[in-house]
Amino acid sequence: MVQRSHRSLVLETGGIQDRNSAKPFQVRRLYCTPIFHAFSFPEMVVNTIRLGFPSFYMRRFDESFADKIHEFGITETMAAPAMLLKIIQWTEKHEEKRFKLQGLRTILCAGAALASRLRASFLQLFDSASVRIVQVWGMTEGGWFATFWYPEHDDTGSIGRPLPTCQIRVSEVSRAELPDGRQVGELLVKGPQLLTAYKGHPDATKEALHDGWLRTGDIGYCADGKIYIIDRAKDIIKVNGWTISPAELETVLHQIPGIVDAAALSYGTGTKEHVAMFVVAEGPSLLVADIKHHLLQQVARFKVATCEIHLVDSLPRSPSGKVLRSVLRHQLQAHYDNVDSGTS
């Protein structure tokens, strides 16, 4: 269990406060993300009361979302990327839902990497060009670390600028240089809002905190005062000595017509480690061969030459919208166990 002080929460909620008085619309929030999540809690519970803007809560995120936006005059909401995808799918089935979304002005987005194509597709739902998708980066161990404040728009793929209470840098231990000269590595965060300890686990606390710097496990870089995330360190795939980002592959997969959801992960160990992809298609017409052909046109051959692709009905996700890669890996192992035993 993560231990944080009262002071850390006070500093975080003050640091994430947006410039509501500068907005040319009344802030009216609809919340439908898990209240216990580090992304949701400081806004849903603390700032809602502290700042006093009208707030509405859905018991669960479902197809009535657009109806609630229209009914209660909602201007801002919070969502994970998977939720944005669902909203797009609902509007494709029911055109009136797109109309009911038009009052939205700001969508705070966190919980997983937001693919550029998904971001663009969601913004196309709106007649107004002033609608903003604002990414948020953080974790339970310290709440929010970075975001953008009104009225800044960003279309560079950044997850935000550091909060006033945060220092963010790239670890010197894991640092590497990209071809364009950018220094990339594990991102470290320091500030008074960080956890005090993992309760009952002093070794884990010592591993996570070094001289006050928290190891986030996220690989990224800093440029022009903005933070960019490449992928989670634990999710990085290594094939024959080459490093592959699942997020990069998933972004390309989401750009293929007919694909509504996708995930990439590593499978196997040592020399047998390779890329495994799971794809949710709109219909039966999409073939694995077509997906492989598209991938070979968009990314370096070594990244996908030995990959395996599986068409599935859905992807397992956590309440916050993150793909549960461990579940997919377990399902894949079970599949091969059945094949080896002759039961599949």
From Swiss-Prot:
It holds the Pfam family AMP-binding. GO terms for molecular function: ATP binding; CoA-ligase activity. Its EC number is 6.2.1.-. The keyword Ligase applies. Keywords: ATP-binding, Ligase, Nucleotide-binding. Gene3D superfamilies: 3.30.300.30, N-terminal domain of ligase-like. One of its GO terms (biological process) is secondary metabolic process. Coiled coil: none annotated. InterPro entries: AMP-bd_C, AMP-bd_C_sf, AMP-dep_synth/lig_dom, ANL_N_sf. Pathway: Secondary metabolite biosynthesis. Residues 2-239, 248-322 are annotated as: AMP-binding. Acyl-CoA ligase; part of the gene cluster that mediates the biosynthesis of squalestatin S1 (SQS1, also known as zaragozic acid A), a heavily oxidized fungal polyketide that offers potent cholesterol lowering activity by targeting squalene synthase (SS). SQS1 is composed of a 2,8-dioxobicyclic[3.2.1]octane-3,4,5-tricarboxyclic acid core that is connected to two lipophilic polyketide arms. Belongs to the ATP-dependent AMP-binding enzyme family. PANTHER family: ADENYLATE-FORMING ENZYME AFEA, LONG-CHAIN-FATTY-ACID--COA LIGASE. This is Acyl-CoA ligase clz12.
